[in-house]
Structure formats: structure tokens, C-alpha cells
Amino acid sequence: MAAEASSTGLASCHLVESKSGAQGASGCQCTRCGRKVSVASGDHHKFPCGHAFCELCLLAPQEYTTSKCTDCEVHTTVSMNQGHYPVDGFIEEDSSLEALPPKMVNNCSSDLEKTVDQLINDLEHSSSIHRNVSNPSAVMSETEEIDEALKIAGCNFEQLSNAIKMLDSTQDQTRQETHSLTEAVEKQFDTLLASLDSRKKSLCEELIRRTDDYLSKLVTVKSYIEEKKSDLDAAMKIAKELRSAPSLRTYCDLTQIIRTLKLTFESELSQVSSIIPRNTPRLDINCSEAICMFSSMGKIEFEDSTKCYPQENEDGQNVQKKFNNRKELCCDVYSSLEKKKVDAAVLTDETPEPPLQAEAPDRHLEGKKKQPTKEMVVVTSPKTIAVLPQLGSSPDVIIEEIIEENLESCFTDDPIETSGYPKKPPQKEQSAPVGSKAGCPELVFVSHVIHPCHFYVRKYSQIKDATILEKKMKQVCNRSLHLDPSDILELGARIFVNSIKNRMWCRGIITEIIPSKTKNIRKPCSPTKFSVCEISLIQIFMVDFGNSEVLIITGVGDTHEGPEHDGEQHITLSDFCLLLMKSEPYSEELLKDIPHLAHLCSLKDIVPYNSTEGWEKEAKVEFLKMVNKKAVLMKVFGEEDDVLIVDLQKPPTNKISSDMPVSLRDALVFMELARFRSQSPRSHSEKNTTLCYHPPILPEEMTEVSVMVCHINSPTDFYLQLMENLDFLSLLKTIEEFYKGEDGENLEILCPLQNQACVAKFEDGIWYRAKVIGLPGHREVEVKYVDFGNTAKITLKDMRKIKDEFLEPPEKAIKCKLAYVEPSKKSQWSKKAKEKFEEKTQDKFVTCSVIKILENNVLLVELFDSRAPGKSAVSINDQLVKEGLASYEAGYTLKDNSKKHLEVWDPSPEEIITSEINNLSPLSVKSLPNENFQSLYNKELPVNICNVISPEKIYVQWLLTENLLNSLEEKMVAAYEHSEWKPVKWECDMHCAVKVPAKNQWRRGQILRMVTDKLVEVLLYDVGVELVVNIHCLRELQENLKTMGRLSLECSLVDIRPTGGSDKWTATACDCLSLHLTGAIATIILQESNTTWPLPVKIFCRDEKGERVDVSKYLIKKGLALRERRVSKSSNSHSPEKSLEIPLEQGDSVVTKCFKINFDTNKKIADKVNEHKVPDSKGKKSESRSTGCYRPPAVPNTSSFEAIVTCIGDDGTIFVVPKLSEFELIKMMDEIQSNLKCLGLLEPYSWKKGEPCAVRGSDTLWYRGKVMEVVGGTIRVQYLDHGFTEKIPQCHLYPILLYPDTPQFCIPCQLYQTLPVGNTWQPDAIELLQELLSKREVDIHIMELPNNSWGKLSVHLYFDGMSLSHFMAHHKYCIFEHTEEIFKEKPRGQNKKYEDENWKIRFEDLLLPEMEAPVLPPYLSSLLPPPEELFAVQVKHIVSPDEMYICLDSEDSYTQFNHHGDTDDSGVSWESESENLEEALQRFNKNVETFPPLTDFSSEMPCLAEYADGLWYRAKIISIKEFNPLSVLVLFVDYGCTEKLTINRLRQIPVQLMQYPAQAIKVLLAGFKPPLSDSGKTRIPYCPKWSMEALWTMIDCLQGKQLYASSVAQAPEQIVTLYEDEQYPVHMSLVEMGLADKDE
């Protein structure tokens, strides 16, 4: 605009110049000297400002050569050569509109006109009158006045231009807003009309429902009255007969008849009188009020458009109306005219700035007048989006248009301000599918409901997509042409429909077409394509709403919808073309980015309340009542077959008065409209299946145990825990880690039961084991924490189902009561008594003396304070009595302590420990390892385990050192809390005070090593912790703090060693030991009288069952350690420390220790340490090292032996087990199974290649194995005794060595002097070997022993006398290295058994009479009804999705189409019997053992075969599968299934059973075929063209449904089409899921 102002000023100057030039063409007057100069002479110079000077005035003064006008001081570039002075640049400062006074805006037009008229008059007057200007100053003042006027004119001109532009913009925007508002009004009132129509239908349905209920009651009462009337009529007839014939009275009870006649029917008549009065139904509606409300409904508000008015419409949804591009024109925008001085500097060689955009003046003006107008936009995150429906309470209807424009910015809960001018348009964001993350809640709208397990929702976040879709659909349908009667419609095709229910154009899919010629029933296998003019009914599914609409043409026969269309919207119209449009390619391209908005859902784990009757109508009504027209929170649990498994919940910030329950699923169950899948209706069997804990393990009576009191209600009602449990803390930690993760979300308990075991969250937010002890209601549950004894009331959200592994450990909390005492007031325990008892026992270790075990496992105990000062424990029971807080029970005799015992007892371990601690020497010398512990040798010493690093480094503290440790800590804090760091030269083994940064504690320590100049590694020897700290955390240890000895001892477990052949303990063993022992109370026993550092000890604790266990044996049992025989110290007397250390390197040889463990229960466990010297080979790694401690296979000491082939390796290696070793292998496997039943839960373990292990196979049996390769989360292992190699998960391995003294049973073999083609056995050759040799008995001839005991044995192998090498060479799989002859058959003379076997077969037995089998005809085949006839069938057996066995469901149909005469084609005559096949089979099953065995195994031979259920059924022989042992494949002709049976399960069939035709009919299904592209990886092995997913889906489609079939062809194969409920082809489910293609 500044440029426009400048141009305006220049134009005004040019105008003046031209006018003056026209009037004064003869000459001009010099402004400086007044001399007149002729214009034609050219001796004058005129400046752009209008002033003229003669050439003399410009040249004379030196300062005027700078091109400066002397009057107005405007600089101008002067060219003396050309004789004139052009303007290269002329810049005026931009005059802003705010510089003008307010009145000038209104009067600018008139002032401008006056100024222009006055200027023209002055110029005309000057042209006619030539006056001499004698005063140059006057001329200059006039010139200045003109310049100032031009400036003002330029500003006014700019203001007028801006005003016009603003008015044009406002005019356009107002029209757009009006148009948009008009559309919104129409849309809202259409919604109101639809709501009124829906309410009308609802009222009509309610009236009909109530009338039907009333009429049904009338019918019931009427039938009851009629029955009474008929009874009375019969009695009256009898009485009349007796009256006319007195002789008959003796044959009946006359008294009873008279009593019956006199009976009154008051109760029956009262029912009539009570049910007949009925209030006449009437319609209660206030139309006048509704009309009045409609007349004032809605209003158009003209408010500040930059504000947001959150309101609430009738549906309870928050809407906002935002006008983004609106601008206002204010009359008082400009307040004053700011006068600015024009910059007179001359710009050289610069172009003027381009004009600003149209929006720039508006922003500039708004900034000058006031702060920019801003609109408040409340932006919410998905978590708080449910707040929106609660804002506002105005009853007015607000015209709305919901358009979310910037979804990416809507992720903050704080309101933000945005300026009024437009922003950059947002980019489109692809919406994520519903339920992409299981458990992630999302707001949705329910769009259509069929029943609670079949409904559709639309995402709240897809409102923008819905709005865009509606606009695009309107655009597409406005441009597209309607259907033509000749257009072809096809089932499954996309189509656009003008939905009556949804009141808009919608996308749809054609799901049903009924042509007008078929009388409303489309026949099976009929065409799926029809022209529009041939269709009488069409059903369309709305993919964006979930509902279906049925369109019916009027006047075409008696067209009416079938029962399958009852729940759909029906529209009757004269022409489909009015509501339908075909989907064209350009429209598909336009809509392809918008996914289907309706998502199919089902409520999780609920079924109809009455499964036999299905979902009641009331369930759908209540469902709609709770979710209709409101946003609800949907929680997704998973997805099954494209159906989201969900629960609809109330948004957390929704109104309390809302109809939406907290959980829709629970609400339907509560209203008895549904039940959970695991429930049985009205069944009380839940109590029998309630999960319960094992009762706590109680100590024996009259024993003393160490316990901790965990919860106290009173001194006669408290709970305690037995101490020294290894796994209890681990159990608590495992429970917390599992349930605090996401896995616990799917274990919610919806209907808790009394005494049900569960896991519950406590006040500290941690999960503990609990059980339900009360159900107070209001979705609250009272639970008891079974490991602590306390109770609490919690909500269902703080409960979870308990896993089996957490259910097995018994309860830890034992209920107790103090013995001998009772409340002092004999009523209740006083508050002071409870507090004192808690003070003495709560969360403390005490000694418990069990007096008696009462009922319900309550212990009667006496507690002793084991921490009391002195040498003897004090009874807490007696203390309560002494302090007056309790009294002894009546009859209790006080203990007599007056007698002093004269016996002298050995000092207790506690006294010895106290004495040792007091006698410890100062720490100035490293004295503790050299202390004399002879007095403690082989005694049980209670300790607290403070830190575990490995089994050979465990730090313990004496129990009595706790007070010393606390006292020492107080001294350390007092000495070093406020101390300052001083530089000290630290060295190894120096003592120091260490500040532990993590705990802010001061501890004594000793420097182990200098890590860097700033970091040192120290040992906190009072607690046994090693850590690296900065030297700024160290202080010099004061001398008075060195007098007290170390408070922790370093110990090492004896008699165990690491697994895996290594000298280092695995991380798994260390972590497991640390997890179970750290912080536990245990007992140690010193194993050596002489001091060895660390102290060799045995550690004992109590496990979950309360049994005392040796920690060393515990590690061995877990497979984390191996037993080691203790070495006598006499042989290593020269080494007082590390006495068990054995050098591993001696000279040039490496010593390998091989530890052997035998689990043989019949032998005493022998622990040996063997040392084998193996030459140090740098070039080749020894293979014996990779096998761990197992021995190589033992090759029989013969040239040939019989064996069984167990496995064929991938490289062609043949693994065999000698027949002589087979029994030993079976025996060892049995022992392994019995010994490995009690393996515990395996902790994380780091596997290494070659490590021995125990493998749990797929048959759940344990095998010896070794690790071949570690690949990610799986491990490739080899079964040592069978040769198999496979990849299995780590959870199926256990690090344990099984029977190391037993050699490997299977021997790897290779064919002697046989080369496979290509030097490696090809895959087809491997397959042939596997098929030929697996589990086969063979003869092995040893030709060459391997160089290494683990190598392959070179052999000749013979199977059934045939040489395997010759066999493989004959089939071109291998060649021979040499031309030496290889026997084609096994030499006869080498094995007598081979010759004997050839003479075992005797033909005489086959001629015996009992071996004769009757000649029987084949089974009669069942026939199907003729084509195009629908008949009921049952599916007996499924071979593949398109091949199965069926039988006729109706017995009449079966008899009609399968009636055979008494004599068949073979001449065999059947006796007609009345019994059917089932009855005949039941009769023959009773004496089946009398039937002769089957001797004729020819194909198609009829027989009786034993099924898996132990019953015998009709069958026929298919083929012989195996000869050793003989097994036959048979087909059960009445069921269609096949099975491989041994001959002892086959019998000759009685002739009487041959008269019945085979029930199972083999058919092929028509209408579909395998898909061309199937992503399913798992195929059916015997039918690879079909996937397993397709097979399972077909089974689901057929199971439990009434099926019908229609025959398509009966020769050469029987082909049928299978239907569900006579209409829907079953294969359509596979086609819709993409598991099959249609076969036209």
C-alpha cells in the first residue's frame, strides 16, 4: 500500500505539472532568483517536486550541485550533460491509516473532491493571469502546503481502497456462512424428524407388546377355567347317573362325588375378576407444549465469531460452531493520524518494495487499534475427550457443524489461544483401526445393534472422515447417473444407496437379490447376476453404519420379505433407480482413502441367559436404551475372525445421571438378560469349582519355632509366619512383577465367589495373595490376605484371577491365640493391651512355643521375646499379666522358678557368639580370618544373610549383632555427617569410612583396588557389600571406630561345584541364590575346625512347606550345582587358604576336571573327581570337550550286530541302537522320568554350545541331550540316545547332567566306501532313507572303526537281507568308491536266524475250516434324492473343505430313497427284520468275541472294526499299511472316517449286517474352489491346495447347525450344495473371508 500511496502522490504531482505546463507554456519563473526563462530555450530545470530553477542558480553556488531542491530539500540525481534531472528513486514513508483523525474517514470523499476542484480552479486562474512572484518565500510556503495536501490525499486514497476490499471480502464470507448455516438448519431438523419418527415406532411397539402380554394372561386364565368347568361337568354327569341308578352307588365313592359337586370356585372367579378390569390405553402427549417448543426452537446468534460457545444438544453431545475466516469491519478502526517525516535520502539503484498482500493491512490495523482478537479453542486429549458431552446446560438447540481440522494438535489437556487469522490447512491423517492395541479404550458411537454379540460401532475419532465421506458422496451422486433398467446387479457388488434410515447417500454391498420369477425364494445355485428390471427384492448392507435395508418393488406378484429379513429396514418403492446408483471407477478412486466406518463388535464372554431360546428382544431394547445416541468408551480385548471382542463402558467423566453403566456387559448380566460364558444358569456348582489355597503348614505341638507376628487383631486373635522360608520372598516378588504388567489386565474377576482364591492389591499398591471372605455389594469385595492375615474391602478393579503356580504354595499366615491368658476385665481386650502387644510383637522375630492345635488350625501359643536383654527369653504372655493388661485363665498354675537347677550345661551358641564378638581384636590388623572358631565348629549358629555374591562368597551376620550395627551406624553419622573432604593418598587394604550414595549411609570399609584416580572399589565389611565409589565419598577411619571387629563373615558353601564343566558359577546360580537368601534368617554349621577363609559352611533354611532344607542340596536339586567330594586337607597342608583349589595347568598339558553324577537309586551316590590329560592341540579343537561329561557310544565288540534305526540325520548319518542295549535304554528312560518329576521352576540360564542338559520332548518325556547351537530364543539340541536334532524353546531344557557314567546309546553310522551324488546326500535321498529305515530292524556289519570315539562308524547295512548301499546305488543316489563287490543280499551263512525265518510260513494252516472267510458282496450304497430337491443332512466326517461324508437326516427320506429288495444282484437273500442298524450293532456288540478273526485282507473287504471308544462298527479294508507289525487301514462305512488298526481289532462281519446300506455318503461340495492366492502357511498335509484355516472355518460353519443339501450331480461323483437354514450356502463364509473363491 505504500507503493500505491507513492504512486498516488506522483500522479498528483504530474497532474499539477501538466496543468501548469498547459497554462504557462511561454515561460517559467526561477524559484530562487525570480528571473523568467523561456521554456523553449531549455535554460531552466524543473524538479519532480514542482519547483523550477534557472541554470545560473543551479551552477553558481557549489552546494546546489548536489541535486538538492533548495526549497523542499528533495534530493535528485542531476545529469549536467542532458540538461534535465530525472528521479531515480522517490520514497515516501508509508502513511498508516491510524494517523488520520476519526472524522476524516467519514469526510474523506468530500474533502478530496473539494481539494481537486480548488486545485483545478487555481490552475485555471493562474493560466489566465500572469503574475510576477516577487517573494520566493511565499512560493515555497505554497509548495509545502501542496506537498502536505498530497500526503493526506495519498493516505485517504489508501483507506478507501482498503475499505472497498474489506467490504467485498465480508460480503463473500457472509454469503458462504449463510449457505452453510442453511444446510446445518436443514440437517438438524431432518434429525429431529427422524427422532420423532423413531419415537412413534417405539410407542407403537410398546403398545403391541403390552397388549400381547395382557392377552396371553387372558388365554392362560381362560384355559384354566375351562379345565375346571370340564371337571365339574364330568362330575355332574356321574352324579345324574347315580341318581337314576342307585345300584351303581356301591361301586363308587359317593361322599367324594358329593364333595366335588359342592366345591366352590371363588379363587378361580377371583382371578377372572382381578384380570378383567384393565385401564383403557391412552396416549399421553402434550402436543401444544411440543408445538410451542418447536416454534421457539433454535436461534440464530450474531456474536463475536472468535468465541467458542460449548453447548449441549439433545443427544448430550458437545458441539462448537467455529467460523475460521471471518473478519469484521469497524467504523472506528482509526484513532489518529500519526505524522511522520518523509525520509529525504536518495536511494540509488534499488527497486521499490512489492505491494503487501490483502491481509497485511488488516493485521496491521488490528495491531494498532487493540490486541488481536483471539478465539479460545479447548483442545482435549483422547483421555479427556469424554468431558465434552458434559459441558454446557442450555436447552436451546445450537446449529452446529462438527469439523475437526487439526487433529495433530489435539493432544493437550490445556486450553490454548489461537489468533483470529487463518492458519495453514492441516494435513490429512490416516485413522488407526479400532482395537489396534488390545486394552486401549476409545470413544465410539453404536450405529446398529442386532444383539449384544452382534453390533456395529463408529469411532469418535473418525467424525472428520464421516463428514468428508458425506460431502464426497453428495458430490459423486450429484454427478453420477441413476440406474438404468438394463444395468446388471451382482451379489457382493458395491453400490450407492440413498438410505431412508440414515437420510443420506451411503456406500453399500448387495447381500441378497430375489428375482421376480422365483416367487420370492432364490433357488440354490441360481444365478447371482440380474438386470434391474428382473429384481423384485434387494438387500443392501451399509458398510459405514452396519445396518441393512431391504428394497421391494411394488406390484410384482405377491412379493414379501422372508423371515431372514425381519430385523431389517423395509422400503417399498416403484423403481430401484430412484434410490440406487452404481459405483463407477472414478467414484471408487475418489473414496478409496476412506475406510469402512462401521466396525463389527461382540461383547466379551457373554451368552444369552437362556441358550436354547437365544437372545431375547428385551436384551436388544435395554442395550439400545443404554448406548443409543451417546459416546461410550470401548475397551478392546482382542479380535476373532474380524470381530472385535469388546466391552462398552461409561466414560470416566460422564454424568452420574447418564443411563450408561460402568460396564455394559456386567449390566446385562445383572439384569439377567445375559450370563457369562463360564456360568451355568441357576447352577450352584460354582462352590465345588472354587479355587482354594492349601492350608498353612503347622508346627507340631510342644515344639518351639522362630516366627514373625505379621498381623494383630487382639492377643487372642493374631497371625504369624514361620521363618526361614527360602521361596516366600521370591513368591511375593514374582507375583508383583507379573500383576503390575499388562498381562494382568486380562485376569479381571467379574463375579467373585465366596472363599475364591485371588490376587488383590493392598494400600501400598502391591499385589498379594488373598481370598474372598465377604460380598457386601456395591461392586465391593471383602478379602483376606492369606499370607499376612489382615482383611480389607476393595473394588473389583483391584482383584485379579490367580495363576496356578501362585495357588499351589500353602497359606503363610497362621492364626494364633495366646495361651493361659484372657482380658483382665473378662470381656474385651483393652486398647492399651492391644497396643502393648503390638509394640512387643508386631513385625518382630519372636520364639513361639506351640502348646496345642485347636480347631480350624488355630494355634494356642506362648511367645518369647528372643531379643530381650539377658541370657534367657522372656514370656510375652507373662509380661502382659505383670503389667496388668491381662489375667491368667482360671485353673492355670504359675510356673515355679524358685528351684535352681544345679546341672551345668554347655554355653549356648548365642553366648559363644557374644563372647567371640567382644573378644574380636581391632581392625588395624586383618585378624578376623585368623580368629579361633574351634568352639563354634559343627554347631548350629543362627545368622542373618546380608549379601550373596555367589555360592562361594556369602556374607552373614550374627543375629545378636543388630544392636551393635545400629550403634556403630549412629557413631558413624555423628562423626562424618558434616565432615569435609580432604585429599588423601589412598592405597589398597586401607580402612576408611565410606558414604553410600544410594542410601545416604556411612559404613566402614576397606579398599580392594584403585579403579582410576577418582574411583576406588571398597568392601563394606560390616554388611558384606562391594561397590565402586568416588574418592570424595571416602574419609579416614577414626581410631575409636577400628576397635570393634568386623560384623559380617564371609562364608562358602561346601560339597558343591558349578555345572557345565566350568570353574565359575553361572549368573543363573548366583541370581537364584541371591534372590532366595538375601535378608533371610538361616542357620549355618562350620565344617572345619581350623580357620579357612572364607568359612566353609552348610546353610539351612526352611522351605515353603516348613521343612528344613540344605541350601547346597537345594541348588543341586534345581540343577544349578553339582555335588563335589570334599578333599582332605592333609594332601594340601601347604596351602592354608583356598584349600580346595587345584591348579588347572601343569606344564604343557591342560587338566580337565570331569565331574560325574549318577541318579541311580539302586546304587549309593558316588562322587568322583577324575583328571585326564589331553594333549594341547592348537590346530584342531578336541571334539571330546564339546560333549560335556557324557561318555561316547559303546560299539559292540563283534563284527556284526542287530540294531534299530532311530534317526536319519540331515547329512545322511544313520543313528542306530544295538538290540542288546535296547532294554538298558528303556530302563534308564524310566528312571529318568521318575527322578525328574520334582524339578523346580528354572531361572534364566545362559546356555553354551556343547553343554549337557535334560530335554523335555514333545511327548512330555525327559531325555539326555546336549546343546548344538544357541539361536536367539531357541536352542538346537541333540537327543544323545536317539540321534534326533531339533530346535526347541529354552523352557524345555534343564541344566542337569543325567547318568554321565552311562555311554551314549545311539551309534552314528555311515555307509562304507559309498559316495553320495554331489558328495552330499540330497534332500530326496534323505527322505527315502527316512521312509525306508525309520524304526526298522537292520543288520550292521562293522567295516571300519572311527579315529575318534565320537566319530561315525563305517558299516554295511542290510534291511530284510537287502544291502542299503546297493539299494541307494540302484536308485542313482550314490556310487561306490571302489569296484569291490558289495553283496546285494546279506550272506546266508552269517546269521542262522535269517534262514530260520524263511521256513516259518506254513500253508497248511490256511486250509483249515476256521480260516475260511465267507464271500460277501460289497456294501449297498445310499442314494441321494433327485436334483433340485432340498433335503436335510448330517455331516459325519470332513476330509477337506470341499469333500466330506454326509448322511440323510430324515428317516423317511432315507427309507424312500434307499429301499432295497430282499434279494440283491448277487443273489444273497436278506431276511426282513424290524430292527434298524443301530439296534443290530448294539446286539452284536454284546457277543463280538464269538466272531472269528478276519483272515482275508483284500481291498474293499467288509468287516467289523473296533473304534477308539471300544465299540465295534461296520467297516471295509482300504489297504495294508505296515507288515511289521501287520496293520490295516479301514474305512468306517457309516461314518466316513478312516483308521489304521492292527489285525486283533478286526472281525468277520455277520451276514445280517450286510442288508443295511452304508450310511455315510461321500460327496463333493459345489459353488467354491481353493483360492488362487492364499496367505495361509499351514496346509492340509493330504490336501495341500487347502489351508488348515479353511478346514477349521468349515468345521465351525457346520458344527451344531441344521444343514440342508441339494444334489447337483450324481455321476461320476456325487456333488451337492450345502445350505444353512435352507437358504444360505455354507461356503459363502469361506468366500467372504478370502479362504475360497466362487466357482461359477
From Swiss-Prot:
Keyword line: Acetylation, Cytoplasm, Developmental protein, Differentiation, Metal-binding, Nucleus, Phosphoprotein, Repeat, Spermatogenesis, Zinc, Zinc-finger
Superkingdom of origin: Eukaryota
GO biological process: spermatid development
Name of this protein: RING finger protein 17
CDD domains assigned to the protein according to its UniProt record, in alphabetical order: Tudor_TDRD4_rpt1, Tudor_TDRD4_rpt2, Tudor_TDRD4_rpt3, Tudor_TDRD4_rpt4, Tudor_TDRD4_rpt5
Residues annotated as domain Tudor: 751-809, 985-1044, 1246-1303, 1496-1556
GO molecular function: identical protein binding; zinc ion binding
Residues where N6-acetyllysine is found: K229
Lineage, uppermost ranks: Eukaryota, Metazoa, Chordata, Craniata, Vertebrata
Function: Seems to be involved in regulation of transcriptional activity of MYC. In vitro, inhibits DNA-binding activity of Mad-MAX heterodimers. Can recruit Mad transcriptional repressors (MXD1, MXD3, MXD4 and MXI1) to the cytoplasm. May be involved in spermiogenesis.
Subunit composition and interactions: Interacts with MXD1, MXD3, MXD4, MXI1 and PIWIL1. Self-associates.
Disulfide bonds: none
Name of the gene encoding the protein in the UniProt record: Rnf17
Observed phenotype of the null mutant: Male mice are sterile, exhibit a complete arrest in round spermatids and fail to produce sperm.
List of residues that carry Phosphoserine: S134
Pfam families in UniProt: TUDOR (PF00567)
Source species: Mus musculus (Mouse)
Tissues in which the UniProt entry reports expression: Expressed at high levels in adult testis. Expressed in male germ cells (at protein level). Expressed at lower levels in adult thyroid, submaxillary gland, ovary and epididymis.
Keyword Cytoplasm in annotation: yes
ZnF endpoints (RING-type): 30-73
GO CC, alphabetical: cytoplasm; nucleus
